[in-house]
Amino acid sequence: MNPIDLRSDTVTPPTERMRKAMAEAEVGDDVYGEDPTVRRLEDLAADRTGKAAALLVASGTMANLVCQLVHCGRGDEMILGDQSHIFHYEQGGSAAVGGIHPRTVPNRPDGTIDPVVIEAAVRADDVHFPRSRLLVLENTHNRCNGSPLGATYMNRVAETAGRCRLKIHVDGARLFNAAVALGCPAADLVARADSVSFCLSKGLSAPVGSMVCGSREFVTEARRARKVLGGGMRQAGIIAAAGIVALTEMVDRLAEDHVNARRLAEGLDGIEGLSADPAAVHTNIVFFEIADRRTTAAALAAALAAAGVLVLALDPYRLRAVTHYPLTGADIERTLAVVRSCLGN
């Protein structure tokens, strides 16, 4: 029996339609701008995000770094949440590669940042300080329960950013999870953003790739930044073909992942010794804790892996599970049975 892999939605396999599209993709040299399949994907991504242009890049980390490099010069400062993926999991690339200073401010439990706190973090025009140039938001917010940030909040933050002369970048790795959860077009969530990135290779199930979207002028500069990072690809239409299928066929089904995540959270919360918060689960990310401290997260994760269920141990007593294609409701019930068995319930 195949293991149930809940470590991340990055483990999604490409669909048969994706494999067929990749095998049949029309290609050219994308560095010369001659790959027609890449162009179609970029046009589609721009349309779905309501932006004028888009750019295919290799990964979400590259997408975020490209956007930071375009918005900020060396010695400039970006403001971002203290729980953001960029701050925790992208190797400090903004500083290491771009010379960009990160200034963290607290994320609230729902992934938002108080606009008052944002405004207070903006530097005065003084030679002692870096220049505040960029505000980064994350939607959905990975470390904050996969919470979606709604359009009302995004628009309110945009007003603050405008007053403070900050550009806005949205790390939208799971932007379409947010759109599905909130029942609105993805474009509505990033209408006021200067740039947005999203992943094709998470819940949308493409094997590789992320998109950077913004104005035509922004994407022209992003293309230069991609090149210096080694991200210029040649016959990239083979990758882009899967991305087209992802955007046209895999968005609506994200709702299934959200249902499975809620069921998983409810089941975990009902197991003696564990705690989860089903009410906090709005998309496909579930955090749960060993409430009675009978074992550690690492030990439980190892026991589950031996029984065919893979999850991530994050902290001494805290774990994460992420639902995704092609997992089913039956897989969730099997997972819960394995957890009960491993805990002796």
What is the role of each PLM region?
Residues 1-279, 283-307, 312-327, 335-344:
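Conserved PLP-enzyme active-site core in the AAT-like
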